Amino acid sequence: MANKKLRIMMVEDDSFTRATVKKALENQGLNIVFDTESVKSAITFARENRPDVAVLDYNLGPGPNGIDLANQLRKSLPDIGIILLTAFLNPAELDSKISSLPPGSRYLVKHSVTKIEVLVKEIEIAAKYRS
């Protein structure tokens, strides 16, 4: 399976959610090379290690949000696949910020992920942005 070779980083401020999603993805054979709650450490890791896909929460606590991080990552790594994984049911709830997602980014509502295969498929789609 091609997705086993993908190098995936996760940025999620909730440690339980981060650990749960990471374990579920690893159980699907995916390679989570880095997970953090910190925007700063995510940027540093990405610049030094060039992951294939970034799975980002929108609300990362005080400071930059997931869209801010997505744009910083795309600026440094133009071909990185990006998934914004959020609790917001409607992108309009993010106001006009949703339009500032980098091209090719995927938007996925956490509550819609009733099976981990949904997120795996989105990761595979996001990875195609690299092509």
Where are the regions that the model predicts?
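Non-catalytic signal-transmission and effector/linker regions of two-component phosphorelay proteins
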Residues: 1-7, 115-131
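Two-component/phosphorelay signaling modules centered on CheY-like receiver
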Residues: 15-34
